[in-house]
Amino acid sequence: MKAEMKVELLSHTPSEAICATAAHCCVSQKIDIIDGEENIRKSTRHSIQSGHDSILEHWSATFAISGVSRAFLAQLSRHRLISLSVQSQRYVNMNGFDYVIPESIENDEKVKEKYVEFMRATSDLYEIMTELHNIKEEDSRYILPNACTTNIVFTANARELKHIFSLRTCNRTQKEFRDVANEMMKICKEVAPIIFEGAGAQCEITGYCVESRGCGKYPKKK
């Protein structure tokens, strides 16, 4: 069955003041709690503009991500400074698994028909293996496709989240990951607007493209 992607914020550091307080700690004789929206914004912005963005590591968020492909998981896991807990294909029976259909396949009726047939055939074989032949899930999972969906609990600090957003909201990013990144970024900007001020694709921040093959929205860096 075709899956629907969902991103949900499970928890986050309650106050943006933590980053401003950390910044103030570095240049003061004692630790003072920075409060007041304008003071927090001024301190945080000054630190980031000065290249002192390690203060962002004191703020973190945890997301639940569902209805995404194992192909997405492979890309997400390349970001090393994150914490992941993933639905196990070894212990969870995947009979009747959901799957992701990329937009290009969705828009080609003939290819989509064959694609869906393949997913159903794979699902049928998986069920035969696990139910009729008592082959364990840990071995039956070898036939599961990259399109098979998974559930993820994902935690990262604000510095790493902004780094992910700078790369994965780019038009060159595969659409599935771009959709997830944009949804996470939207949520982060709602709960921590000061910290995530200016978050987004690198080109939106710098005004030029650093990709070897850009989308054409911004000129290449000379």
Tell where the protein language model's regions lie, with residue ranges.
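Family-specific signature for flavin-dependent thymidylate synthase
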Residues: M1-K222
